[in-house]
């Protein structure tokens, strides 16, 4: 869609869309913008065209299930919105010093996490023309004030050398403009690799990426839209962006000890990413949190198709009891008890009593206090 010059200028200066209006407010209500108290974190999502960026983003933020991503296209912009998410596609045309017109493509999304924390997600188009412009005419604009760079690699790419070249160009721009940014590399589409080869291929790719990233450090994840690995990676990324996460974890531990729970997890309400957890002993399945995220997210989607909303769930047998319930305005909580003789009502009352305290902790500028109630 063609924009006027004034619209382009505004978009380039603001570098992001307005937030969705509250319920009851008409679309496009004047004055509904990001509040001044919001703590914005700029996140770059980059990678070559076809690497799978749009599919993974649509699953995490737009409530797609994996099989529906095959039909992604023009409908993606119709689906990638909720009470927390607003998205806009910006295509800029610039004229260089010799009169050539260049175009680049960035989709901006504002995703609200935990009260005042807002992720300003820049999904950068991966076509060669766009990539070259990011490193030349728009270098400072794209790579300035970045908190996190997420670079997605297609594990089966036939242009690995070019992929690595673009990644190194990103690192050079980050080092110059945002040297404190955290770097995440997602080796994506691992489901296409033979199962007995996955560990070896990922290890080799991880070693290459760590070597190329020096002097910066990068965290590498193997991912696929078909299993819990996608949630594992994005939970780890979001965890790095939560400003008071240590305070949150300390209070979560106190809460678990007070109610004698084996495990307590906090899920972000819209995405169901794990943002914090406490466990009193090691468990056999290291990926169980992400598996739960995936299962509950799909169950929530099934509920929405029936015009119902997911609020809580209880699973109980002779060995344990597990509760998933709305916790704060931005989170769900999961409590696992190894003593199934404890009445459900007692656990649910404890969850309810802790809500107000954790609501305060979610505020970026909230009080730094500890849970001491009994």
Swiss-Prot record:
Q: Name one GO molecular function term.
A: guanyl ribonucleotide binding
User: Per the record's keyword annotation, is Phosphoprotein included, yes or no?
Assistant: no
State the protein's name.
Answer: Ras-related GTP-binding protein B
Classification via PANTHER family: RAS-RELATED GTP BINDING RAG/GTR YEAST, RAS-RELATED GTP-BINDING PROTEIN B
Which residues does the annotation say bind GDP?
50-55, 69, 75, 188, 191, 209, 225
**Subunit details:** Interacts with RRAGC and RRAGD; heterodimerization stabilizes RRAG proteins. The GTP-bound form of RRAGB (in complex with the GDP-bound form of RRAGC or RRAGD) interacts with RPTOR, thereby promoting recruitment of mTORC1 to the lysosomes. Component of the lysosomal folliculin complex (LFC), composed of FLCN, FNIP1 (or FNIP2), RagA/RRAGA or RagB/RRAGB GDP-bound, RagC/RRAGC or RagD/RRAGD GTP-bound, and Ragulator.
Localization terms from the record: Cytoplasm; Lysosome membrane
Which organism does this record belong to? Homo sapiens
């Amino acid at each position: 869609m063609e924009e006027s010059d004034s619209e382009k200028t505004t978009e380039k200066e603001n570098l992001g869309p307005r937030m969705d209006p509250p319920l009851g407010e008409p679309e496009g209500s004047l004055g509904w913008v990001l509040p001044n108290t919001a703590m914005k974190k700029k996140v770059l999502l980059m990678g070559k065209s076809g690497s799978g960026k749009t599919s993974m983003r649509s699953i995490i933020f737009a409530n797609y299930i994996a099989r529906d991503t095959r039909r992604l296209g023009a409908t993606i912009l119709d689906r990638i919105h909720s009470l927390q998410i607003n998205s806009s596609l910006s295509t800029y045309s610039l004229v260089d010093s010799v009169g050539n017109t260049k175009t680049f493509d960035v989709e901006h999304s504002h995703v609200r996490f935990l009260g005042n924390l807002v992720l300003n997600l820049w999904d950068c188009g991966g076509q060669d023309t766009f990539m070259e412009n990011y490193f030349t005419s728009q270098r400072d604009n794209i790579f300035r004030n970045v908190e996190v760079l997420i670079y997605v690699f297609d594990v089966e790419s036939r242009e690995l050398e070019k992929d690595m070249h673009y990644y190194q160009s990103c690192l050079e721009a980050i080092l110059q403009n945002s040297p404190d940014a955290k770097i995440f590399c997602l080796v994506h589409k691992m489901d296409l690799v033979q199962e007995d080869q996955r560990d070896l291929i990922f290890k080799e790719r991880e070693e290459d990426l760590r070597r190329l990233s020096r002097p910066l450090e990068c965290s590498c994840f193997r991912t696929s839209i078909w299993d819990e690995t996608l949630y594992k990676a994005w939970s780890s990324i979001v965890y790095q962006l939560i400003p008071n996460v240590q305070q949150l974890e300390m209070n979560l531990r106190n809460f678990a000890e007070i109610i004698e729970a084996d495990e307590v997890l906090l899920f972000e309400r819209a995405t169901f990413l794990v943002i914090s957890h406490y466990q009193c002993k090691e468990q056999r399945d290291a990926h169980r949190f992400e598996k739960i995220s995936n299962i509950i997210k799909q169950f929530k989607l099934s509920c929405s198709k029936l015009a119902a909303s997911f609020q809580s769930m209880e699973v109980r047998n002779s060995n344990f009891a597990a509760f998933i319930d709305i916790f704060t305005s931005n989170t769900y909580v999961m409590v696992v008890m190894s003593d199934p003789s404890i009445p459900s009502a007692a656990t649910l009352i404890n969850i309810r009593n802790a809500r107000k305290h954790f609501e305060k902790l979610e505020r970026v500028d909230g009080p730094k206090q500890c849970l001491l109630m009994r």
